[in-house]
């Protein structure tokens, strides 16, 4: 019997995909789930996949690989999509696809499948990664083929086959969780005019209910990578887990946004990224201290393009690798310590130090002029403003003024 390897999350979409693939393709279905830091969600997957009709399931622990090879490069790049989204789902999809291909090769499968909808970004991310890594594999996307047209239809389909799913008609939210973030979409969130219900947040305390006393965290970076939290050297997974807890308790990391999907429509999502938000802002503060003006400003352009590549599923492309090479050069001096103050949803800097600081206090203060002669500014302004002056004079001469 021919085999298909399904990217399995245990959620609604992939739960109903198992019997559907068997009924419509006659495949032996092998499930593959990536442990990206979902935590307790993984516990019931093995039994659930088998009960749903899978012949076996692989649960791959890729947490450290996720952090070191996907999260940290994106963090160093300073990538954030449309000013708010820290790319938690986008970064995870190419890694899941990579593991999907590895299991397919191991099992001799002729196809892979995923549970992404035909309206979303994830279908693109999964399939571009598979095409880049294994162009010979057939890709099946049930949502683009079956008669199920809504999450409610999928719940009915699962119920008819005795498949337990975590989504009910009363709470039909689509969730995606990993070490970096938790996303919420669907139901009443689809109307951007609605405030998210108070029970939506699962990782972060609502800011108004957060402690009345601020919390401080000290993060040490080496070449753009966080290595210590409050003076303690930690492995990357533990560092993010601890920071998630501290930031979440203080209401930090909520992003409620309407974003432009790759497939051409806008969508509304609520993202919880507690630790990631702190790391992103802390890293930015350290760059402001250690990078020169030209490098910093050009890196902002790179960050925007990097975010688009990751969001669009273009992880395994030469351009992303080339941008990584540029970013790595910029991070040579991004070493130091940043203290961040967390208070009722706010995350602000409370001190930054680096042995590579480009800030010269004596030069920057309004004191004596031994180092910086203020009279020199006049000549600089005359030369810097010369194009403006010449243009104005020529326009006046031509009667345009």
From Swiss-Prot:
Record pathway: Amino-acid biosynthesis; L-arginine biosynthesis; L-arginine from L-ornithine and carbamoyl phosphate: step 2/3
Reaction(s) this enzyme catalyzes, per UniProt: L-citrulline + L-aspartate + ATP = 2-(N(omega)-L-arginino)succinate + AMP + diphosphate + H(+)
Enzyme class: ligase
Binding-site list for L-citrulline: 85, 90, 121, 125, 174, 183, 259, 271
Keywords annotated in UniProt: Amino-acid biosynthesis, Arginine biosynthesis, ATP-binding, Cytoplasm, Ligase, Nucleotide-binding
Gene3D superfamilies attached to this UniProt entry: Argininosuccinate synthetase, chain A, domain 2, HUPs, Single helix bin
Localisation per UniProt entry: Cytoplasm
Gene Ontology terms, MF aspect: argininosuccinate synthase activity; ATP binding
Binding site for ATP: 7-15, 34, 115
CC per GO annotation: cytoplasm
Keyword Membrane: no
Residues that hold L-aspartate according to the record: 117, 121-122
Matches recorded under PANTHER family: ARGININOSUCCINATE SYNTHASE (PTHR11587:SF2)
Protein name: Argininosuccinate synthase
Record lineage: Bacteria, Bacillati, Bacillota, Clostridia, Eubacteriales
Name of the gene: argG
